[in-house]
């Protein structure tokens, strides 16, 4: 990996792209530290310091994707979460709305239209999420238990509220624009790179918090245990993310005029983890809802106490069981909507392709479904284990869920984005090495 980056820096145009990407990253991290107008920075810091010493996992998912900017209430407080949510919603709607499905099949022009819809939905979600965050901050519920939580927004006039919401919405639009700039003029997928940076930015403080709150050898045993578990998980994730089942495909030879077409062989790569990190995000978001209901209802009823005791603590067996089962369910659900065996079989039949030993058409679709279901089982179990291992490791030392709110989500995203970016750099390096033969 380091060799690839070193070679990229020696190539003038790639060096320019890498430096441009680094410049955008610096701007993004700068925006994550500029407070929103109307917020008392001193009171926010007091509450953040107190929250970092305890278990404040309720807003952990959004805070992780914003690189810690959410709880700091900065102009980039919402981070890329509205964009991720909008992308997932449109991906799901593509399956149920024929118009969106037709746009998806139109190629580049259709994809441009879907991207436009994603932008509009991102802004709408940013307004909703920004309004919710400001309302939560004004009421003091953002930092429950903090003595100055209700003084985070000293001036609670309607004008101040509107300014805060507009600023956060504009910040989300700016983040989206920065991501698109990286995609167009930098290295890698822009939004993925910003997601990578947001998660990586929270690692140093999270690891140090584990050390300071640890009890064995001044916290050093917990500290190095978490690092060791992290390295093992990264190795496992890299191995599984690269694993795939290759379905061989042959194309019949056709004569058109005097030219011969086809006769080639290729394969369909079916990844073991075909669903990616989406099931973990879905499961985390769903378990996030009961905690929100309890926090905002302030109810002392039996059901609220049961939820508070069993479904908001990551170390509780009920929570871990529900989390694991939801991940397995969403893995199968997302694979079912993102990979259509019948469509793949029809496209193969249209261009004269077939799987050796399998008839074209419906038998091919059934075979692909059979193989996909078989490899999705180990993929879903792997996702569930990766999501729970950090929680169980920290629980063994009495500090679970305080720094890695949703298990292996961060590691899955970091490894996935890292592998994809390295592949793109290597691809561009190979392309430039072959330029001499193409002249």
Tell where the protein language model's regions lie, with residue ranges.
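N-terminal cationic and glycine-rich segments that engage phosphates or anionic surfaces
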Residues: 1-104, 109-439
């Amino acid at each position: 990996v380091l060799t690839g980056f070193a070679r990229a820096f020696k190539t003038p145009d790639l060096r320019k792209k890498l430096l441009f990407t680094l410049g955008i990253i610096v701007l993004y991290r700068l925006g994550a530290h500029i407070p929103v107008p109307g917020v008392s920075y001193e009171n926010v810091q007091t509450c953040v310091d107190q929250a970092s010493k305890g278990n404040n996992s309720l807003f952990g998912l959004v805070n992780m994707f914003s690189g810690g900017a959410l709880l700091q209430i900065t102009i980039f407080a919402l981070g890329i979460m509205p964009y991720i949510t909008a992308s997932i919603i449109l991906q799901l709607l593509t399956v149920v709305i024929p118009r969106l499905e037709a746009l998806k099949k139109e190629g580049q022009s259709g994809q441009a239209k879907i991207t436009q819809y994603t932008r509009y939905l991102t802004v709408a979600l940013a307004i909703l999420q920004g309004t919710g965050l400001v309302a939560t901050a004004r009421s003091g519920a953002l930092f429950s238990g903090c003595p100055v939580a209700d003084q985070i927004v000293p001036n609670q006039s309607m004008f101040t509220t509107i300014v805060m919401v507009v600023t956060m919405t504009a910040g989300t639009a700016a983040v989206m624009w920065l991501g698109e700039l990286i995609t167009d003029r930098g290295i890698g997928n822009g939004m993925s790179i910003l997601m990578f940076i947001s998660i990586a930015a929270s690692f140093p403080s999270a690891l140090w918090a584990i050390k300071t709150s640890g009890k064995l050898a001044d916290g050093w045993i917990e500290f190095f245990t978490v690092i060791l578990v992290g390295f093992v998980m990264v190795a496992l994730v890299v191995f599984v993310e690269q694993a795939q089942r290759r379905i061989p495909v042959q194309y019949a030879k056709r004569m058109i005029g005097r030219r011969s077409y086809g006769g080639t062989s290729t394969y369909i790569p079916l990844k073991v983890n075909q669903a990616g990190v989406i099931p973990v995000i879905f499961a985390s978001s769903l378990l996030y809802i009961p905690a929100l209901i309890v926090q905002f209802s302030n109810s002392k009823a039996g059901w609220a106490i049961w939820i508070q005791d069993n479904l908001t603590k990551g170390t509780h067996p009920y929570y871990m069981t529900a989390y694991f089962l939801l991940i397995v369910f969403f893995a199968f659900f997302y694979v079912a909507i993102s990979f259509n065996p019948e469509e793949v079989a029809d496209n193969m039949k249209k261009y004269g392709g077939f799987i050796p030993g399998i008839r074209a058409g419906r038998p091919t679709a059934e075979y692909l479904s059979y193989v996909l279901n078989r490899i999705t089982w180990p993929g879903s179990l792997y996702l569930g284990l990766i999501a729970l291992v950090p929680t169980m490791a920290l629980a063994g030392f009495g500090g679970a869920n305080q720094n890695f709110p949703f298990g292996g989500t961060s590691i899955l995203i970091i490894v996935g984005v890292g592998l994809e970016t390295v592949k793109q750099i290597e691809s561009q390096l190979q392309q430039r090495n072959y330029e001499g033969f193409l002249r």
